[in-house]
Amino acid sequence: MLRSLLVATLFLSAWNVRAQFNISGTILDAKYNRTLAGATVQVDGNKTGVVTDEFGRFLIDKLAAGEHALVVKFLGYADRTENVNLQSHVSLELALDETSVLTEEVVVNATRANEKTPTTFININKQAIQKQNFGQDLPLILNWTPSVVTTSDAGAGVGYTGIRIRGSDATRVNVTINGIPYNDSESQSTFWVDIPDIASSTQSIQIQRGVGSSTNGAGAFGASVNVQTNSLQSDPYAEVITAAGSFNTQRYTFRAGTGLIGDRWAFDAKVSKITSNGYVERASSDLGSYYFSGGYYGKKTVIKAITFGGNEKTYQSWYGVDAATLSTNRRMNNAGAIYDASGNISGYYDNQADDYKQDHYQLHISQQLGGHWNANASLHYTWGRGFYEEYHQAATFNELGLADVTIKDTTLTSTDVIVRKWLDNKFYGGTWSFNYNQGKSDLVIGGAYNQYGGARHFGEIIWAQYAGLMPIRHHYYEGKSQKNDFNTFVKWNFDVTERINMFMDVQYRHVDYSTAGIRDDQRSYDLNESFSFFNPKVGVTFFLSEKTLLYSSYAIANREPNRSDYLDGTVKPRPERLGNIELGLRRKTSRYSVEANYYLMNYTDQLVLTGQLDNAGFPIRANIGKSYRTGIELSAIIRFSDRWTWNVNATGSINKNQDYVILENNVPLTKNTSIILSPGLIGGSQLTCNIFRHLQATWMSKYVGKQYLSNTEDENLTLNSYFINDVRLSFQILPKGVKEIGISLLVNNVFDVSYSSNGYSYSGTPYYYPQAGRNFMAMMTLKF
């Protein structure tokens, strides 16, 4: 009997030592009872912890029986500590209270939508961004969000990339970084290649589709992308990321931060290097970037200084390939080609490159005022400078603004030259907002004044076959530009009843733009334009329950033409006007979240792509009178179990020019044609399986429907539909001595589909931008 009791005691003791249990649960907002995605849950002082998923859920497994302390942290909320006596598997529901301590989020809140805003938007948190960040440009990371189509000139996602949302290209998508406009003031486009690997310094991104709420910079005519860079990390950290893959693509990133020093100060730093040969021939990229910040964090005051930027050198791959070349040599790149007397390519100029550097400086000050008010002010300065270099054969001296050269008795009218086309510009100004939050009423009064000043466009000749009396680095064209942009807005969200919320948003914007000089074709230009715009928005949100809401809104937006519209268009361009209706439903439970919305975007004098490019590879646009985009967007995140999650979206749309004039047999006809590069169907899917706690696999699929390369709806000028599948594997190891080792593998285009994601037409000939077939990226992350 004694022996049996001893054996049983030893057995139970051994079982108790070896017993391992799980703690799972959901993190909620105490005020609104909504789940919080991206909250950190730490156990027993482990600084690594886990991060809640899209449904605010977490799982910590393999914990020994006994007492454990959970600490939950989320930006803008007070930390919560929960003690758990673990004797079996435990499931918790923990609510966090909003903190009265000021956080950095107030800097972007003035231009972001929230749960009560009756507009269509999606938030992407840091966890989701980092999962997909293998070193590709930010548009490729956003590829899986609704109504998005992305493209890469080099075909592999590194270098020049583009994004279209609801069929609208980058010139029509407003981008802000910490509330500061990022779109180039003159072209209105965004060049993510100038700030490579900005994703590794990003805390969150909000995409508003349609007009959205008032923001700084050129108005959103398809969508807005609101980027917030890294926020405070209270604990010290260091991180080393290395990645390598197809086309000799390599990425090296180092990040570190001091954590909170003396409960007041914090400093962060990042440097990054990305190189790639590109899928397209010679489409190489050599990219470097940095991010440094220092902040003071008081209970009622936050002051943060940030500088970030990058330098890029990319071999040009701007012109695509024609259909015949696409079928025989899809990686062909004509940029830099040198032709012999017979018209055959005899070689390539080795420095047909784009070389540009951009530095950003931002100072943000946030102050908690008395009562329910806080104030924010930001100053910013951006300096960009660089050139693209090109080899030109048989350029006439007349084109170069020079006299013909006479050698003995022979007069030469042309010469081979190497030119550099420069842009040196500065962008500076300030933004401000006053925010009032009283629970039932949210009021934002804000605005900005920005100046694009001292911008110089000039070209220099660095070599000529026949120079004559040409001086060294002769400037054969030069011009200057300045643009002043002022806006002020008022946004008011107020509860009419417990279930009905009204939203009103009014913005006034004034723009002065002047530019003068000589173009690269020796034509002179002198523009002086002023615009005043009034952009009202109104909407209502109905809370059917704590989990379900309906919203509807109507918004008006106006915007000015860009530089190219004036210089490359055949007639003087007119400002555009957009009326946008949004109707939507959102429902979120612990198992799924779903959103369905209808949109109508009615344009007057929309500037649409003509399908042609200027001599720098930029699309040419023209006013077309009336046009519209209308469609239905569906998106859902479904949690089938703790192991399986499906993130899926689909957009069906009609995009039409209502009175586009087409010449048929020299007779002008008005037709209802499809808008260029606007697919009628876009779908995205991410099916994720948590194979076990530290191993995750995701199957990603993207479908993009047929697109026209001309507004004439010519069936010979089309971009075929494509369906692409990728696979991502992520594995974490938690060894002693480091917080975490992460190993990830990304297989793009698993089925090796030959496709093109972008194109244009020139003189009735289609040109395409082919994308890479099956390719790989592997990444290792060390966290300390």
Region annotations inferred by a language model:
Residues Q368, N374-H380, F543, L549-A557, ...:
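Membrane-embedded beta-barrel scaffold of Gram-negative outer-membrane proteins
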Residues W646-N649, I654-K656, Y703-L709, F731-F784:
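C-terminal beta-signal and adjacent terminal beta-strands/loops
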Residues L59-K62, P181-R209, Q228:
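Short acidic/polar hinge/loop motifs at secondary-structure boundaries
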Residues A448-N450, Y476-Y603, R639-S641, T651:
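Structural signature of Gram-negative outer-membrane beta-barrels, strongest in the C-terminal barrel
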